[in-house]
Regions:
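Cell-envelope/ECM-targeting effectors and their regulatory/trafficking segments
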Residues: 1-154
Length: 154
């Protein structure tokens, strides 16, 4: 059986000068990791400095470019009951992409029943093409990557 990670779209490359998506998700994840950045969707000097600081903390190449290694280190697994900026990042993805549950899903940082239903619906849609995707309501590495890379988008 092919693993989900082998067939899911690659992580996007995000760098200074990029705007809106997936910069807002990046900024929410940086905040969840303790970096003081404004979530404005603009990858400016403050976001660049936070990315470089994060890369240095994690022993990654310090280049200010958010690619596969930085995304993988940055994501935080969230599930029903989770709260905070990582959850806001998930909710932002659903709203931006107008995915199932997205239009009515508040970006409030609370992983409640509506967010859980949206995540499970997304995982179900992925599962149809990639049977190894679990439909468990947990946003771990595979679900994060599918969301951020734009699978099933718009």
């Amino acid at each position: 059986m092919t693993t989900a990670a082998a067939v899911i779209s690659p992580w996007p490359l995000v760098r200074q000068g990029d705007q809106y998506h997936p910069v807002k998700t990046l900024q929410y994840l940086l905040r969840a990791r303790g970096h003081n950045v404004t979530v404005d969707g603009i990858f400016g000097p403050a976001t660049n400095a936070a990315v470089r600081a994060f890369q240095q903390q994690k022993g990654l190449a310090v280049d200010g470019i958010v690619g596969p290694n930085t995304w993988s280190a940055l994501i935080i697994t969230v599930k029903q009951g989770s709260q905070g900026d990582a959850v806001r990042g998930v909710q932002e993805e659903f709203q931006f992409r107008n995915l199932s549950g997205g239009p009515g899903l508040a970006v409030d940082g609370i992983f409640g029943p509506k967010t859980d239903a949206a995540v499970r619906g997304f995982q179900q849609a992925l599962h149809q093409d990639i049977p190894s995707v679990a439909i468990d309501g947990i946003v771990g590495p595979v679900t994060w990557r599918a969301l951020v890379s734009g699978m099933l988008a718009l």
